[in-house]
Amino acid sequence: MMTYIVFILSIIFVMGFVGFSSKPSPIYGGLGLIVSGGVGCGIVLNFGGSFLGLMVFLIYLGGMMVVFGYTTAMATEQYPEVWVSNKVVLGTFITGLLMEFLMVYYVLKDKEVEIVFKFNGMGDWVIYDTGDSGFFSEEAMGIAALYSYGTWLVIVTGWSLLIGVVVIMEITRGN
């Protein structure tokens, strides 16, 4: 049952990406990103990553919602274009959905995914093994490694997000 839940969430995830990649108006692009981000957090939660899913949900959908709201407010149109108002955008949206449904058919026909990697077990996803010490939470070890060995990565990521917000505000401010 969990496999089908992840499969359905993955379909919604890709449909959200198709929705914002074929966006005719910034409002719908932000909506597609919000849907995809929320569903992505649900997928991470389904695999047991409660801390990571919560952090992504709070940081991405909390922090970036401010940026989406600000840029959408600055780029509002009186009559926003929707997916069906332009034939090229509608064609792109339908083509993306068709590709997703063909992928779903291919996966359901063979009962596994073997396009680039073969995902038929979770044993390949083990990150850190401590030998005879028993069961450890991968999340706790990952967070400890991120903040101990990856300090510079956290600093560069925070700085990049700050610069990204400043650049977006300067672009949308106008003259």
From Swiss-Prot:
Root EC class: translocase
Molecular function via GO: NADH dehydrogenase (ubiquinone) activity
Keywords: Electron transport, Membrane, Mitochondrion, Mitochondrion inner membrane, NAD, Respiratory chain, Translocase, Transmembrane, Transmembrane helix, Transport, Ubiquinone
EC number: 7.1.1.2
Reaction equation(s) it catalyzes: a ubiquinone + NADH + 5 H(+)(in) = a ubiquinol + NAD(+) + 4 H(+)(out)
GO BP terms, alphabetized: mitochondrial electron transport, NADH to ubiquinone; mitochondrial respiratory chain complex I assembly
Transmembrane feature ranges: 1-21, 25-45, 47-67, 88-108, 149-169
Annotated localization: Mitochondrion inner membrane
A GO CC annotation given for this chain: mitochondrial inner membrane
Name of the featured protein: NADH-ubiquinone oxidoreductase chain 6
